[in-house]
Swiss-Prot record:
HAMAP family: Ribosomal_bL34. GO terms for biological process: translation. Keywords: Ribonucleoprotein, Ribosomal protein. GO terms for molecular function: structural constituent of ribosome. InterPro entries: Ribosomal_bL34 (IPR000271), Ribosomal_bL34_CS (IPR020939). GO terms for cellular component: ribonucleoprotein complex; ribosome. This is Large ribosomal subunit protein bL34. Belongs to the bacterial ribosomal protein bL34 family.
Amino acid sequence: MSKRTFQPSVLKRKRTHGFRARMATANGRKVLNARRAKGRKRLSK
């Protein structure tokens, strides 16, 4: 049997998918702008 791949951790989630992580790189800012343009309610986790 294989283990479950989703092992939740708030810290890991924020560091990889959080708003400040997105703002830190040019591509991350692209992601945020794309989500703004699409009209997403939540921009990041």
